[in-house]
Every structure is written in structure tokens, then in C-alpha cells.
Amino acid sequence: WFPKKKGLANGFTTMGHNCGSAFYVPLVSMMIATFGFANGLSYLAIGAIVLGIVGLLTIRSKPQECGLYPDNVTKEVYEREYFDGGKDENGGWTVVKLLKTKEMWLCALIIGINQLVTTGVMSQLVVRNTGLGFTQEAATGLMTVCALIGVVGSYLFGAIDQKFGVKKAILLFLAWYCVALAINCTDTTMGVYISVAMIGIAVGAAANFIVSLPASVFGRHGFTLVNSVFFPLMQIVLMTNYVVNAAALQITGSLRGAYFVYIGLLVVNMLITLCINPTKYNKDYAVEDQLKKG
């Protein structure tokens, strides 16, 4: 729907991702307390089914199905500035061809490391803060605040993505994340408060890039196939979090030390990000570039 406005589009849609993180656990607790374990979870399941049916009836895969054009542009702009050639649903890609493409592996590594670090940080945040003297309730509350602040991060980095491109947005995100974790490692109360706010923004931003980076590199043509290859590869990198986490704790002997390992991974990810061409196979941007040259 939004091939050239994906930054802002992802900025808005991933707000829901962060709201879900902030409110789902309290919602489950409230439902169980009110209706009991079985009934409470059953009502949530029914709500999810109803939401799915509403989505099935109202959501369309392509804007043309609603008489519209991508990015809400006019027909004239679409025909002039967007690629509309070819009827191949896969955009000329095959699974084997994608697996042989360097950019596919770069996308999987970049986003996988982002998510690896985010999963590691968030899974340890409560334990880390209780270890610094916060009560269990206060530490849990800080995690909820972190998720809510992520709503701001989603929009902020979505706007940065839209303005400067996904590559520069990711590099800024990685630098921001490094500073946030470094501040947390000061082991001070003020440092915790500042880092929770900064980590919240980073967590919100991280969700944006899961779609934005591969969509920017490969474009909308054949993206369903691209995503079906990219996502499992990214998940494999993400799931090494548990091995990395355990090794970091064993080597450093503390959660603080593990955070320094995460900072190192983020720095490595900056170097990987510098290697990627963010629009290499994007046919819409290719048309736009030709217009600028011609």
C-alpha cells in the first residue's frame, strides 16, 4: 500500500505493536481476575477471532482493489513515477535466487541482530532493575513505561526513515541504542530512568525496520515471497539470543556485562548496515531515479 511512504506507515502501524506489549499482560491479568483462568482466556480468544474476521472483511491486499493507487497518489503520478510492468506475482524472484542474493542475508543479519539485542534487553530489564535496588513492582512498572514510550519511538523513527531513508534511520537507531545501554550500565538511579526512556524509543523503532528494510531493498514486487524467505532467516539470527545471552552472562558474570556485549553487537551491526544498498532491487525507486536523471 505504501511503497514510498513506508517509513511513516510503519511508524503508525507499529504503535499498536508497542501498545500490545504495554497492555496485554495487564489485560490478561484483569480478565483472569474477573472471569477466572479458563473463561478469561476464552473471552480473549473470542475477541481475537472476531478481530480476525473484521480484518478479513475489511482489509485489502492492494490499493487497486479499492480503486486507489499506492501511496494514495493519482493515476497520473502512479503511471509516471512507479513501476507497473510485468505480471509475475513474485517479481522475478525464486527462493533459490533470493538465497543467493547478498542483500537478503544482509537484511536478515541487520534485523536479526536488532531483534536479538531487543529481546535480550527486554527479557532482562525487570531482573536488571531489581538488581539495582528497585522493587519488583517498580521494575515491572518501568517495563510498562518502556513499552508505552515505544509508541513515540515508532513514530519518531518512522518519520526519520521517511525523511532520510531506512539506512540512515537504522544507523541512528543503533547509535541511540548503544548510548541507552551505556547509560544503563552506569548503575545509577538517574541512569536507569534515562535509559528506560531511551530503550523504550529504541524498542519502538526496532519494530519498524522488520518490514521497512526488506521492503526498501526489494520493493513491493514479489514482496510476499521475499518476506517468506527473509523472515525465517531473521528469526534464526534472533533465536541465537538465548545462546548469546547465556554466553555473555557466563563470560562477564553479570547482567551489566551482558549489556556491554549487546553494545558490541550493535556496533558490529553498524558496520554491516554500512554495506547494504537500501534500494538495490526496488523497481519503484529505479523509475524515480530515471526521472531525476532524465
Predicted segments with their positions:
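Intracellular juxtamembrane helix-capping segments at the cytosolic ends
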Residues: 1-2, 10, 205-218
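Helix-loop-helix hairpin linking two adjacent transmembrane segments in secondary transporters
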Residues: 17-66
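A late C-terminal transmembrane helix in Major Facilitator Superfamily
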Residues: 21, 217-252
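Interfacial helix-cap and linker-helix signal at transmembrane-aqueous boundaries
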Residues: 23, 27-36, 129-130, 160-161, ...
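A membrane-interface helix-boundary motif in multi-pass transporters
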Residues: 33-46, 247-266
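C-terminal membrane-cytosol helix-exit motif in multi-pass small-molecule transporters
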Residues: 46-82, 272-277
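Extracytoplasmic gate region of multi-pass secondary transporters
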Residues: 93-157, 241
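C-terminal transmembrane helical hairpin of 12-TM major facilitator-type secondary transporters
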Residues: 144-157, 161-213
